[in-house]
Structure formats: structure tokens, C-alpha cells
Amino acid sequence: RSAAFVLSAALAGQTLATGFVPQNVQAAQEGTQESTTETGKLIDMKAAIEPVKASYGYYVDVYQTNTSANLTPESNASIGVLSKMLDIFTPGDDWNTGTVLDQTTHQANLDKVKEITANRTEEEKTRAYLDDRRNQNYSMTEGLGGYAQTFIDGAEGQTSITDTIPEDATTVKYDDAYGDNAPWANTDGTYGNIAKLVNTIRGGAASTSSAKKYYKYMRPFRWSRLNGEYPQTTIISSLKPQEKADPSNDGGYPSGHTNGANLAAIAMAYAVPQQYSQMMLRSSELGNSRIVAGMHSCLDVIGGRMMSTAIAAANLNAEDNAAVKAKAVADGQKLVETVGAASDYESYQKDKETYLYRMTYNLKLDNADTTKEMVVPKGAEVLLETRFPYLSADERRYVLYTTGISSGYSVLDDAEGWGRLNLFEASNGYGAFATDVTVDMDAEKG
């Protein structure tokens, strides 16, 4: 059974009710689509979702430039997508010789770290330790919620880092045995194709090393030790053995753990879209735990999310990955059917606010321009491909356009728009109706 109705553009700017998921939404594509904003500005909606090319090109086309041989924003897409940091900080020749250009934002960034670390609870310290020491792929399985244990059992997911912190962790470094040296999951096991997709995306020109080497923005505890000029913050005692003795090869921006976690989360969300929002929330939790740990600043974590979002989209667009994507989705739906669990949206509003806060940490200058139009990166629509399989590519771009956050936040206004994508919100459908939208409700599709 199906039914069609039209939603007027008069609803433009109105947030959709929680839980509303449009089925087979088809925006009229004939001629120029226009919508009037609250300020009376007429928008050409077709033009609004056109991608904008950055100095390095389009990320999804040039993502493989992220190598150690390319160390400029123009030659390396990952360095380029993070380049709004250059409004705040100019890298020096050495790890501690850079120049702070925007003292207000830099100070606010470190003040926020001090605030978070000064108020960390024992539970938060334990979470920060586990998120630091465990393979991020394994950590992200928690975002699968009611499907997590069945997935772990079937894919033989494993970690050697137990839930209890060893008493000697303050002096002994514990590494996850199932990280770099052994598989975190069996890609040939039940649901193994989900693990394979995670590995594929994390292995696709995804390293933060070149960006760290270029920006040379110190970790917060090192800023604390610089002439006593900045807020004093410390690493949690159980992670003290993880501090590298050589600071010259240990930059903070962007956060590698955040990058890895978000890549794994997006891969799992692609395979199990029923858990999309929860996967994004778990990813943001791990990023936040890097600040709780004292290992990273807010800007580091924000950069890790931005970069990984672009990397994930690039790998999901790559033709060579089509087969592993399809198999992962098949395994994901087999997992859902086997468990028969339902997603928990009881805390939607709270989770929405938490995720939004962690996107920005409210780092924004008082005179920042908050009126820039949203930009949707080329290829970003693939991130919602399985969440909204009944929408066209352009329609998924509209979803991203209407759920993006406002401009003006520190480092987030990159040329292509990766920093402003709010995947938690986007996974819940249109943020507003920017044009007349025809909805074809098909009961067979839920």
C-alpha cells in the first residue's frame, strides 16, 4: 500500500518531529527550486547543494593524497580539510616553536580542557582509560546497542584490555593484543563483513600522522608545561605510561583516536543503519574521553571528527569498495533480523544536545560570522546511503543541508563543508523542508 502527499515549502525552517522518517521523499527536480528563508532571502535549492571545491580539490576525489610525501594543505587533502586551524595557529619548524594567532580561541580551547579534566569522575577516568587502550574498532561496537553482543559473538570480536584497570597501570603500559598485531574480529566469521568494512575504511588513506606532523599543535599537557603560561592540566594517572618521551613526533591536532573511532562508527552505521544515531553518539563519547584523559584538546578532537568524516565518505564512494559495502549491509541486516531488537530513542533529545555540544565545544569568537550558507561536500550523501535508501542522492544532500550546524565555530568552516555536517541529526531525517516535497509512503518499507 502507498500514499502520496505534498509538504509545502511554507514549512521551511520548521524542525521535524522526533522519529519522523520520510519514506521515498521526492523533491521536484524540474526547473529551479526556490525557497524563502525567515529573513526573506530567496534560495535556489538546487544550487545550494552544489559542492564547493577546496584548494586541494574535492576530498572524495583526492583522498589518497594523504601520504607522508605531501605535507601542505594544497597537496594533502587531510591537511587541507583541517586548514582553518591556520587562523588560530601557525606551525613552527619545531614541535614547540609555532605562533598563536588567535589567542582568544587558543586560550578558550585550553580552558575547556582544564574544566573537563578538573571535574572528571572515577567512572569517566575508567572510560577514558579503556577508550585509550582498546582498539577503537572494538570500542565502537558498544554503539550497536542491543545488537552488540551478538555481533561480537558472531564476528569473534576481542580485546585484551579488561573492564578493570590494573593496579600497576600507573607504571606499566598495557597494549591491546588485538590491535595492530592481531585481528580485533574475524572477517570470515558470522557478521565478518561488517568487520571487513571497518578495516577497509580505516585502511583507506586514513592516517592522521601527516596532519599531526604539519600542524605541530601541542597536546594540552605540553601547553601546560610551556613557561607556566597556560592552564595546568594533567593526564589521568593510569595513562601516564602512554606519554611519549619525544614530543617532536607527538602532535595533538588532529586526534588519532577520535579519527579511528569515527571511521569505525561510520562503517558500522553504514552496515547497521538502525543504530546510526547511537553509533555517532558513541564516537563522540570516545572523542570526549580523549579530553577527559588529558591527552587531547577540544580542537584536536574536533579535527579528528572532521577528517574522519571526509575519509569515510571517500572510501564509501570508492568503486573498489562496492562489494565489501554490499556484503557488510547484508550482514548488518542479518544481525538485525537475528536479534530482533529495537533502537532506543528514549533519550533522543538529550543525546542530540550532547552530540551537538561535542561537535563544537562552543568554541566561537564573539564576532564570528554565523550567517554563512550551509555547504554540502561532494560525495557526502553516501554517508546516508543505507540510512535512507529510498532517497535519491540529491535528496540525501538536502538532508545534510538542512541538518548542518551554523557557521562561525572554530576550525569548522572548511571550504567543502565537512566540519558542519551533523550526522546524528542527519540520520534522523530532514531538519527542515526547504522546498515543496512529495512524500510517497510505502508500507512495505516501514
Residue spans of the language-model regions?
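Sec-dependent N-terminal signal peptides
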Residues: 1-12
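Sec-dependent signal peptide cleavage junction
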Residues: 13-30
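Hydrophobic alpha-helical bundle signature of multipass membrane enzymes
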Residues: 29-292, 337, 354-446
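Alpha-helical transmembrane segments that form the membrane-embedded catalytic/substrate-binding core
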Residues: 257-261, 292-321
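Active-site- or binding-pocket-proximal scaffold segments within functional domains
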Residues: 325
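Extended charged low-complexity segments that act as oligomerization/scaffolding linkers
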Residues: 328-343
